[in-house]
């Protein structure tokens, strides 16, 4: 994968400016799996090949009409090139079947206008609208957005915001093919997933270097792609592929509160503490509400760092940084042991009627870094030692059947990543 871009800003005068950006992103994924029988005969089980290239053009003009009225209007044009050929065997040692195939290009075009209006010295109103269309299937959306902020004291503010947002799915979803439909892409007419967002915000300036925010929110999703009469929803997608017919009949609901306490960098010290308490539910194709895969219920982060100026003239910098996370455990569905034993490949089967009803214990994750920066007149050298997931916290990847013990066990794995880096700036 890779990305690059260039940006240009032009000032017509003190009140009007135009910003234009050209960018390109590239992603390629190749994967194969081979299955073996008891005689060590092999057969291909999975063959995934897909690449996506996006050319993105964005331009926006910002105009300050007065001290209390500013407007920003812009467009984004994304040219999406795709090439995918994805095959999967229904069972081990069976011939692979085509599940998604497509090659070509399409366009995602969006435009927006947003205005900031100073109603008074304490109250600011932001209103706007966003529109977008996907030419692949002519799906379109018109999304009103508005927010109001009341600075009712020098240290305290209150804000309320509402907006409608829409998104397209990953490109492979639109080109799913099934054995019963032949070359027809069964999901090509899928519409956008849409959502209403409402957020409150209370901000309090504790001091010149410290700020606190409390932000309750509510999100209602609709037109979510799901499998009819099933608990499946794309909101829980974590596989590299989708192989089923989807319909825009699902829903989702997120409600929670975010609390943030932040000390800005001052005298070499900074820190931030965040706490999120939330509930995340989805409504599947079987018309039942359940926990989403991501409903951890809480996440607490503490991060901070300290910088010391050292050296003969105090021009060099030694720094220590850390991040600690405590979050609810991974969600999973109970294993259907009978169905697993009946499966010819002993592939673990789950009780999808109770999808994501189980939860592992909370997770404790730590990261830290130590750095030293040498500053010279025309060049600087920075050395750093970093460690990600220092505590070796294990993530959940599913369950597997152990043929030696005839037992089903969860697959857990920890990715701890220490590294040493050097950066040269001139």
Language-model regions, residue ranges each:
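Outer membrane beta-barrel strand-and-loop segments of large Gram-negative receptors
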Residues: 54-56, 60, 99-112, 187, ...
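Gram-negative outer-membrane beta-barrel transporters
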Residues: 218-220, 241, 245-329
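Outer-membrane beta-barrel channels and translocator barrels
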Residues: 13-15, 62-68, 120-124, 151-155, ...
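Surface-exposed extracellular loop regions of Gram-negative outer-membrane beta-barrel proteins
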Residues: 28-30, 83-90, 135, 155-198, ...
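Residues on the lipid-exposed face of transmembrane beta-strands in outer-membrane beta-barrel proteins
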Residues: 6-10, 57-63, 111-117, 146-150, ...
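Face-selective signature of the C-terminal outer-membrane beta-barrel domain
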Residues: 2-138, 151, 206, 210-213, ...
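Extracellular loop and loop/strand-boundary signature of outer-membrane beta-barrel proteins
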Residues: 1-7, 41-48, 56, 60, ...
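C-terminal beta-signal and adjacent terminal beta-strands/loops
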Residues: 271, 313, 325-347, 361-365, ...
């Amino acid at each position: 994968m890779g990305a690059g871009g260039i940006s240009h800003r032009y000032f017509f005068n003190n009140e009007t400016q135009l910003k234009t950006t050209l960018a390109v992103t590239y992603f390629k994924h190749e994967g194969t799996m081979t299955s073996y029988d008891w005689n060590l005969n092999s057969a291909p089980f999975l063959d995934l090949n897909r690449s996506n290239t996006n050319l993105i053009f964005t331009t926006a003009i910002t105009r300050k009409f007065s001290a209390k009225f500013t407007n920003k209007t812009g467009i984004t044009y994304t040219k999406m090139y795709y090439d995918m050929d994805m095959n999967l065997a229904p069972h081990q040692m069976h011939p692979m079947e085509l599940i998604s195939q497509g090659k070509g290009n399409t366009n995602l075009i969006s435009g927006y206008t947003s205005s900031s209006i100073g109603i008074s010295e304490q109250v600011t109103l932001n209103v706007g609208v966003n529109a977008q269309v996907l030419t692949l299937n002519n799906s379109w959306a018109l999304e009103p957005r508005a927010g109001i902020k009341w600075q009712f004291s020098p240290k305290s503010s209150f804000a309320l915001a509402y907006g409608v947002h829409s998104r397209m799915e990953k490109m492979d979803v639109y080109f799913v093919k099934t054995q019963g439909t032949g070359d027809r892409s069964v999901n090509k007419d899928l519409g956008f997933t849409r959502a209403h967002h409402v957020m409150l915000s209370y901000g309090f300036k504790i001091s010149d270097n410290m700020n606190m925010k409390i932000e309750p929110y509510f999100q209602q999703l609709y037109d979510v792609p799901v499998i009819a009469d099933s608990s499946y929803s794309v909101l829980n997608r974590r596989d590299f592929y989708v192989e089923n017919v989807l319909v825009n009949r699902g829903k989702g609901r997120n409600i929670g509160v975010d609390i943030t306490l932040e000390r800005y960098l001052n005298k070499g010290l900074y820190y931030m503490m965040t706490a999120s308490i939330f509930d995340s539910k989805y409504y599947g194709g079987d018309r039942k509400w359940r926990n989403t895969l991501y409903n951890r219920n809480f996440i607490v982060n503490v991060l901070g760092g300290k910088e010391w100026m050292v050296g003969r003239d105090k021009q060099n910098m030694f720094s220590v940084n850390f991040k600690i996370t405590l979050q609810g455990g991974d969600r999973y569905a109970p294993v259907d042991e009978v169905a697993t034993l009946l499966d010819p490949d002993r592939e673990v089967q789950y009780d999808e009627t109770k999808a994501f009803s189980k939860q592992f214990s909370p997770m404790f994750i730590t990261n830290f870094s130590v750095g030293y920066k040498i500053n010279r007149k025309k060049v600087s050298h920075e050395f750093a030692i970093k460690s990600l997931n220092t505590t070796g916290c294990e993530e959940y990847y599913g369950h597997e059947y152990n043929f030696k013990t005839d037992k089903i066990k969860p697959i857990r794995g920890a990715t701890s990543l220490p590294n040493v880096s050097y950066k040269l700036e001139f």
